[in-house]
From Swiss-Prot:
Gene: ord
Function field: Involved in the ornithine fermentation pathway. Catalyzes the oxidative deamination of (2R,4S)-2,4-diaminopentanoate (DAP) to yield 2-amino-4-ketopentanoate (AKP).
The EC number(s) this enzyme carries: 1.4.1.12
GO MF: 2,4-diaminopentanoate dehydrogenase activity; nucleotide binding
Protein's UniProt name: 2,4-diaminopentanoate dehydrogenase
Family: Belongs to the DapB family.
Gene Ontology biological-process entries: ornithine metabolic process
Self-association state and partner proteins as the record states: Homodimer.
């Protein structure tokens, strides 16, 4: 069997990390990279940590030049956070008859906020015989799929609290902007009031995924709250900077109600360089049920590595999947791939033979 052929679209913090990870793996190769601006015409190896060595070069190109019909088995789409912004790119890729894994947060469960676009993506994917998945560390695993997994050992579930205390330091400029890193408290509050500050993108998706997975019908729209985390020391991450007195993070909560009762709560304070101020990161799944569940992982699963690994490790599942739009609750569970990618892929499902 030919190696699994991968195109990466977007070579920022996440896309570049996926390239580095793929280059360490067996049975898979990067056959194209899509970029823009000054990146066009440069070598992929100019933008990632892995040296080229004796590998064949991969030149960054425009979408129309790199993504041609059946040019790869999958495109890792590492741009955008919102389904509506990612839609045209997804449409372009699936119409070239290539599978898609998107790191856009809303794509983890697009039916939560964009049901019509989700139906259209599903239709386009089926029409072209390919599959589409959105995943990442969160949404995609920690605050939703992991929670769902832990309900599997419960006879009854009365309520759920999913908490993630994490560092934003690995993430790129798009996330820094969404979280308001470096702005003043006044600018943050104005952004919240005007709806221009996204904060964490994914509560609707995580709550919707959990509710649908275990059979709860939400009785009211999902709500969320958003508060600034103000730093008293200067903090600098690879892609963000917050001077003392400004915003270094965003504390968000999300709430899902069933029959008027709070059943699913999300608690998600995240900031750059939390260790500078003694904040202990961690992931927590707290289920009030039969039995009670109190799962703790501390420090947190790092968001950057986690998102990179989730997207790369789901490649076999999306290639093998039936055509259409998928989510993490209808595909085989993610797992590390320590052997050859080809061993996990059905030959008839492979696009590049």
């Amino acid at each position: 069997m030919e190696k699994v052929k991968v195109i990466i679209m977007g070579l920022g913090a996440m896309g570049g990390g996926m390239a580095d990870m793929l280059l360490k793996k067996q049975g898979v190769e990067i056959v194209g990279v899509v970029g823009r601006g000054k990146m066009l015409g440069t070598s992929m190896y100019d933008h990632i940590s892995t040296p080229r060595g004796d590998r064949e070069d991969v030149i960054v190109g425009a979408m129309e030049d790199v993504i041609t019909e059946k040019a790869a088995d999958v495109v890792l789409l590492c741009t955008d956070s919102f389904t509506r912004k990612a839609f045209d790119k997804i449409k372009f890729i699936v119409e070239k008859k290539i599978n898609v894994i998107s790191s856009a947060e809303e794509m983890a469960y697009p039916m939560a906020q964009e049901p019509e676009l989700a139906k259209e993506i599903d239709r386009l994917a089926k029409e072209n015989g390919v599959s589409v998945l959105g995943t990442g560390i969160n949404p995609g695993l920690i605050m939703d799929l992991l929670v769902i997994l832990m309900t599997g050992c419960c006879e009854e579930v009365h309520s759920i609290l999913s908490r993630r205390v994490n560092s934003l330091s690995p993430f790129g400029p798009a996330v820094m902007e969404e979280q308001g890193i470096g702005i003043t408290v006044e600018e943050f509050n104005k952004g919240v009031q005007e709806g221009t500050l996204a904060g964490h993108v994914g509560f609707h998706e995580s709550i919707g995924m959990i509710a649908d997975a275990i059979g709860w019908k939400l009785s009211a729209p999902i709500t969320q709250s958003m508060e600034p985390i103000v730093t008293d020391v200067d903090r600098k991450s690879p892609y963000g900077f917050a001077k003392a007195g400004n915003v270094a993070g965003c504390a968000m909560k999300g709430f899902g109600y069933v029959d008027g009762e709070l059943k699913i709560e999300m608690d998600h304070p995240q900031q750059i360089e939390p260790e500078q101020v003694g904040v202990q990161t961690g992931d927590y799944v707290i289920i009030n049920g039969v039995p009670n569940i109190n799962m703790v992982n501390s420090p947190e699963v790092p968001g950057g590595i986690g998102t990179i690994a989730m997207c790369v490790n789901m490649i076999p599942q999306i290639i093998n999947a039936r055509p259409g739009l998928h989510t993490m609750i209808d595909l085989p569970v993610p797992r590390a791939i320590m052997g050859d990618f080809r061993d996990l892929i059905s030959e008839e499902a492979k696009i590049v033979k």
